[in-house]
């Protein structure tokens, strides 16, 4: 069993950029493109993330932002959608239709969400209804779900059609825009709140796609933070902090920015669950996070056109919590005989870029300590975790958090064994594929 490294309360990351060493057999063949598709509904919708409530208007529009990558042999598509979450069956349905229309395989597609809690519900309620039935006494919105899926497929086709010669650069930055949200009382009771002494991950992971002349195609910014600056009283559709910061950075650089959430399971924005936009200035995050992304971008070295992409997948099998039911649409994610709790089959995706960058993703709300531990043990100079990817199977807390209790330890189908099961598989996979 892999020992977990002790963590300090905040990970201090100095802005840095490591030039990528090009892959000789893919020299100069790299192409990239981006597409942005508006998915703002025209009617009021049930909003995800808090107790059931319907939208009453629109504060800012929400989008699919789609990047297409092509190294001459492999194409890969990364999506950031201004949504809260969706069941893995939605991803499976969308990618099956995408394959029928385009031949693109699911392994080539990562569909992440920013986790804003002020966007419409998408897809069947899945595990959420088993864990929080009081929130889901209404029917899923099949019409909006179908629209979101269609617009995404259209956007992937658009990005693919626009592929053009490009370069890729990678680096990191730092932002103190997040805070641990597992507040601890004098009696040790854990509740949702703010805990400035708790673990955080404040690294910004950055990937820049640029034209051969150096002008930007798109920026991919990876940062860990719940999309909960607005609380349940807000009923206006909004991208929350991720959408606000993306729009700010886009205005500054003249190109789209994909906000890719990270291990935000126990991390909140430092200004959180505000009742309305009148109660605070959400644009403060343009300074706290947006300007830090821009500074990290300015520190990146010139990108390389010598890029090799290696997408792959592993499956983590881990025990299911006893007494928890299962959603019939998620049969592919559970292995169990009749009457047994069985094991959950959690897909973990990887994308290796040359020999310097490892991206990994999972359909969970991961605690930041786990992502940091993987990064510390990774043989790659840059290891970024892309969270909320390809569906949602619940929170994935640490073993210590399971012992302490709290909201996240009940809103998942796992046992306290899951941290070690995931960590051991991911680190072994990274070590086994290092070159």
PLM feature spans:
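Conserved beta-alpha junction segments in alpha/beta enzyme cores
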Residues: 23-112, 116-258, 262-264, 270-273, ...
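Anionic-ligand-binding alpha/beta catalytic cores of soluble enzymes and soluble regulatory domains
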Residues: 289-290
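Cell wall/extracellular polymer interaction/catalysis modules
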Residues: 293
């Amino acid at each position: 069993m892999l020992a977990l490294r002790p963590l300090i309360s905040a990970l201090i990351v100095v802005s840095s950029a490591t030039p990528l060493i090009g892959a000789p057999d893919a020299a100069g063949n790299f192409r990239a493109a981006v597409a942005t598709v508006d998915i703002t509904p025209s009617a009021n919708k049930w909003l995800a993330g808090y107790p059931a409530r319907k939208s009453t208007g629109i504060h800012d529009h929400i989008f699919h932002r789609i990047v297409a990558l092509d190294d001459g042999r492999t194409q890969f598509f990364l999506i950031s959608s201004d949504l809260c979450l969706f069941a893995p069956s939605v991803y499976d349905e969308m990618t099956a239709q995408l394959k029928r229309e385009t031949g693109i395989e699911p392994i080539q597609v990562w569909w992440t969400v920013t986790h804003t809690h002020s966007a419409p519900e998408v897809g069947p309620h899945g595990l959420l209804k088993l864990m929080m039935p009081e929130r889901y006494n209404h029917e899923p919105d099949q019409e909006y779900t179908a629209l979101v899926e269609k617009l995404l497929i259209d956007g992937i086709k658009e990005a693919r059609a626009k592929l053009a010669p490009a370069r890729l650069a990678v680096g990191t930055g730092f932002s103190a825009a997040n805070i641990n949200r597992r507040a601890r009382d004098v009696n040790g009771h854990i509740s949702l709140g703010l805990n400035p002494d708790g673990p955080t991950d404040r690294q910004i992971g950055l990937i820049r796609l640029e034209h051969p002349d150096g002008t930007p195609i798109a920026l991919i910014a990876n940062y860990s933070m719940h999309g909960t600056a607005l609380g349940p009283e807000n009923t206006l559709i909004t991208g929350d902090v991720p959408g606000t910061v993306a729009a700010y950075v886009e205005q500054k650089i003249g190109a789209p920015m994909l906000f890719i959430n990270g291990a935000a399971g126990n991390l909140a924005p430092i200004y959180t669950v505000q009742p309305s936009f009148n109660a605070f200035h959400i644009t403060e995050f343009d300074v706290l996070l947006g300007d830090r992304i821009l500074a990290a971008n300015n520190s990146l070295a010139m990108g390389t056109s010598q890029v090799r992409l290696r997408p792959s997948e592993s499956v983590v099998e881990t025990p299911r919590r006893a007494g928890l039911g299962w959603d019939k649409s998620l049969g592919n994610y559970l292995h169990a005989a009749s009457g047994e709790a069985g094991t959950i089959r959690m897909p973990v995706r990887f994308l290796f870029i040359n020999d310097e960058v490892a991206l990994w993703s999972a359909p969970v709300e991961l605690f930041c300590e786990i992502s940091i531990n993987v990064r510390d043990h990774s043989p790659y100079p840059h290891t970024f975790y892309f969270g909320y990817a390809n569906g949602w199977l619940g929170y994935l807390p640490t073993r210590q958090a399971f012992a302490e209790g709290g909201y996240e330890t009940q809103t998942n189908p796992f046992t306290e064994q899951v941290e070690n099961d995931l960590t051991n598989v991911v680190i072994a996979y990274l070590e086994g594929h290092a070159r």
